[in-house]
C-alpha cells in the first residue's frame, strides 16, 4: 500500500526579513518546513527565538556547516549553541550531520533528532551506505537522512535499495541530488520514505529540488490514475 507523501518546504532567506517572508509563504502551502538558518548572513540564538515565534507549523531546524554542504562557518560549539537553543525553544526536529554528531550533544532533549549524510559528488555503493547507516544507529536518532548526487540509473537503484531495506521501525529520508535524483524525490515518500523536500518561489537549497506546486500536482495526478476503479474487475 502506498503512503501519503509528506512534503516539507525549505526556507533559505539570507536576511532575517527575507527568511521570515519565505517562512510565511511556506506555511501557507504546507504543514512542514525546514528552516535552513545556516543561510542567514548573521545568526545568533536571539534570531532563533524570533524565527520560532513566527513558526506555526512543524519545523526542522538545520544549521549545516560549509564542510557538510551548508553555509555555516562557525565552530561545532557554535552549532551546538544554536541547536540547543532550538531544542529549548520547542522546535519539532533538529538536523545534525553525521560528521559532527559526536561533537554535538543536545541536553534535556525535547526535539526529535535527524542524523544526516550528504554527498554532493556521487552516490556511494550500497555497502558503504549501509556502513554509514550502522554508524548513524549509534546515535539512536528519530530519523535517518541520506542525500547523494545521483547522475545515473545505478545511483537511483542504490538509493531505492537503501530505503526499501530499512528496518520497519526506522524513519528514513532518501533524496537524490541532480536531474536523475528527481524521481527519488517524488517516489521515496510513496515507498516508505519519511518525507521529501521541495522549494517555493524558486528558493532552491539543493540540486534537483522540485517546486512545491509541481510536486503537489504530480501526487494529485498520480493518485487519480492509481486509485482502483470501483465496480470493475
From Swiss-Prot:
Residues the entry annotates as binding 3-dehydroquinate: 34-36, 64, 185, 205, 209
EC number, as in UniProt: 4.2.1.10
Report which reactions are catalysed by this protein. 3-dehydroquinate = 3-dehydroshikimate + H2O
- Which pathway does the record list? Metabolic intermediate biosynthesis; chorismate biosynthesis; chorismate from D-erythrose 4-phosphate and phosphoenolpyruvate: step 3/7
Biological process per Gene Ontology, one example term: amino acid biosynthetic process
Note the subunit structure: Homodimer.
Do you know which NCBIfam families this protein is assigned to? aroD
Q: Which family does it belong to?
A: Belongs to the type-I 3-dehydroquinase family.
Q: What is this protein called?
A: 3-dehydroquinate dehydratase
Q: Which organism is it from?
A: Coxiella burnetii (strain RSA 493 / Nine Mile phase I)
- What would be the name of the gene that encodes this protein? aroD
Amino acid at each position: 500500500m502506498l503512503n501519503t507523501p509528506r512534503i516539507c518546504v525549505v526556507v533559505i532567506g539570507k536576511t532575517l526579513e527575507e527568511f521570515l517572508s519565505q517562512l510565511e509563504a511556506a506555511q501557507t502551502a504546507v504543514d512542514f518546513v525546514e528552516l535552513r538558518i545556516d543561510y542567514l548572513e548573521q545568526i545568533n540564538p536571539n534570531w532563533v527565538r524570533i524565527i520560532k515565534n513566527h513558526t506555526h507549523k512543524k519545523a526542522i531546524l538545520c544549521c549545516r556547516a560549509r564542510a557538510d554542504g551548508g553555509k555555516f562557518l562557525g565552530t561545532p560549539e557554535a552549532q551546538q549553541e544554536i541547536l540547543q537553543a532550538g531544542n529549548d525553544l520547542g522546535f519539532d526536529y533538529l538536523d545534525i550531520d553525521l560528521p559532527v554528531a559526536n561533537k554535538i550533544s543536545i541536553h534535556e532533549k525535547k526535539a526529535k533528532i535527524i542524523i544526516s549524510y550528504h554527498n554532493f559528488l556521487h552516490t556511494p555503493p550500497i555497502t558503504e551506505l549501509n556502513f554509514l547507516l550502522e554508524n548513524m544507529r549509534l546515535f539512536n536518532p528519530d530519523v535517518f537522512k541520506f542525500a547523494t548526487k545521483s547522475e545515473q540509473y545505478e545511483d537511483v537503484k542504490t538509493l531505492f535499495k537503501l530505503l526499501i531495506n530499512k528496518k520497519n521501525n526506522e524513519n528514513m529520508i532518501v533524496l537524490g541530488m541532480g536531474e536523475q535524483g528527481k524521481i527519488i524525490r517524488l517516489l521515496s515518500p510513496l515507498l516508505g520514505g519519511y518525507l521529501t523536500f521541495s522549494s517555493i518561489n524558486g528558493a532552491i537549497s539543493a540540486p534537483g529540488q522540485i517546486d512545491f506546486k509541481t510536486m503537489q500536482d504530480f501526487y494529485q495526478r498520480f493518485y487519480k490514475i492509481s486509485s482502483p476503479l470501483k465496480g470493475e474487475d
